[in-house]
């Protein structure tokens, strides 16, 4: 497969399964497509862990079986939760032409990132000889060879002699493995194309979702659509995601950051749309299963939103709103328990990989305000984008 066509197929594998689940959950097409990748990751997460424990191989057919099972479950839950649907609120969704405007901005941002990938990836069917890139490609190969895709069974790959238990988030790789089976691509090719697809789509769409969530309550539909489209296009200009994240081969981390914002927005919408709770649980499971850091980004956003907004503007009363959020959090924690236990068993190993920066608290705050990290030391600070961001924050 070629880079452009292969990326298109990878986008379909990433977006389509979750979009089907979202439509079953009665989400509109724009919302379903935006949250689709997070739900896809959630479906994969709920498949690979029990499959690994039961010895069921992960492949295209078992992935399809997991999707069908989740679709049936979501259908049943929607029938049970139908009485909680807020049809009046649903009627306030985005109109057709404003949605087209937003889609144009998302597509422009995606094309700009794709063009950068086309110009920058000269040997895209192979991977660089860095530990992370080689590990990710090997993990895809391991899944294709053995059918074992569970995050809690990665010790079978990492610890060849002892097979000592090891937790490593493998949802991203499981999606890439299905892509390889569908297209016949090599593991290195599938890994690269899946990474490009995540980079191309998740950040423009995530920027659009967050901007719409912030602007629409305080602005008219067309103005919100224009600002949202602009933000989606500008998302291709930030250095850290996806470019530097892609360059250091932090692909699960990249994908988790990309689906964190749509998941956050979906969870906030459950206060008014309680029938979306199952979809929110599935999306949050997906984010945590791709990489734990993405899940903690969601939690930080939720805490900020609750303390700065929802606490003072409850939808159904503070206790009722807390109960709704708890209905999302508790099932998520129960589903993720095996993965959390796996991480806790590796606490000493994780501590051994600490990277002290030796920066003062003051310098840390300055770096945060300037959107700077150690990986960006070789790049200039994007003062123009920073100023625009803070100007928008001041206006809001």
Residue ranges of model-derived segments:
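Membrane-interface transmembrane helices that cradle and orient dolichyl/undecaprenyl
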Residues: 260-278
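Active-site lumenal/periplasmic loops and adjacent helix-entry segments of GT-C-fold
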Residues: 108-258
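Membrane-interface helix-loop-helix junctions at transmembrane boundaries of multi-pass membrane enzymes
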Residues: 95-96, 218-224, 312-325, 393-396
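Membrane-embedded, hydrophobic transmembrane alpha-helices
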Residues: 1-99
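Alpha-helical transmembrane segments at the extracellular/periplasmic loop-to-helix junctions
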Residues: 4-14, 256-257, 357-396
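Membrane-interface alpha helices of multi-pass inner-membrane proteins
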Residues: 266, 277-292
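Hydrophobic transmembrane alpha-helices of multi-pass, membrane-embedded glycosylation machinery
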Residues: 286, 298-312
């Amino acid at each position: 497969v070629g880079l452009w066509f292969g990326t298109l197929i990878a986008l379909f594998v990433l977006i389509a399964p979750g979009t089907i689940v979202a439509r079953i959950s009665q989400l509109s097409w724009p919302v379903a497509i935006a949250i689709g990748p997070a739900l896809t990751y959630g479906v994969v997460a709920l498949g690979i862990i029990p499959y690994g424990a039961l010895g069921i191989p992960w492949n295209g057919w078992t992935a399809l079986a997991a999707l069908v099972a989740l679709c049936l479950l979501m259908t049943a839950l929607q029938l049970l939760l139908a009485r909680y649907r807020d049809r009046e609120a649903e009627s306030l969704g985005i109109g057709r032409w404003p949605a087209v405007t937003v889609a144009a901005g998302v597509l422009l941002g995606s094309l700009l990132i794709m063009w950068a990938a086309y110009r920058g990836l000269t040997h895209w069917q192979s991977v660089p000889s860095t530990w992370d890139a080689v590990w990710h490609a090997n993990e895809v190969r391991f899944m294709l060879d053995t059918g074992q895709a569970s995050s809690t069974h990665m010790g079978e790959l990492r610890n060849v002699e002892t097979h000592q238990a090891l937790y490593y988030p493998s949802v991203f790789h499981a999606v890439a493995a299905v892509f390889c089976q569908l297209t016949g691509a090599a593991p290195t090719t599938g890994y690269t194309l899946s990474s490009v697809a995540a980079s191309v789509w998740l950040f423009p769409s995530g920027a659009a979702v967050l901007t719409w969530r912030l602007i629409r309550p305080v602005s008219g539909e067309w103005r919100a659509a224009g600002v949202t489209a602009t933000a989606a296009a500008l998302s291709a200009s930030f250095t850290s995601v996806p470019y530097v994240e892609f360059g250091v081969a932090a692909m699960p981390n990249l994908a988790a950051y990309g689906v964190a914002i749509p998941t956050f927005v979906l969870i906030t919408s459950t206060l008014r749309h309680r029938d979306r709770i199952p979809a929110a649980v599935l999306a949050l499971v997906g984010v945590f299963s791709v990489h734990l850091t993405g899940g903690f980004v969601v939690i930080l956003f939720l805490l900020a939103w609750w303390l700065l907004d929802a606490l003072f503007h409850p939808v159904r009363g503070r206790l009722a709103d807390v109960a709704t959020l708890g209905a999302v959090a508790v099932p998520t924690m129960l589903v993720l328990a095996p993965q959390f236990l796996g991480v806790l068993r590796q606490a000493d190993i994780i501590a051994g990989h600490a990277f002290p920066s030796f920066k003062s608290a003051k310098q840390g705050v300055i770096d945060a305000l300037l959107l700077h990290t150690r990986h960006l030391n070789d790049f200039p600070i994007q003062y123009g984008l920073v100023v625009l961001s803070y100007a928008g924050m001041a206006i809001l």
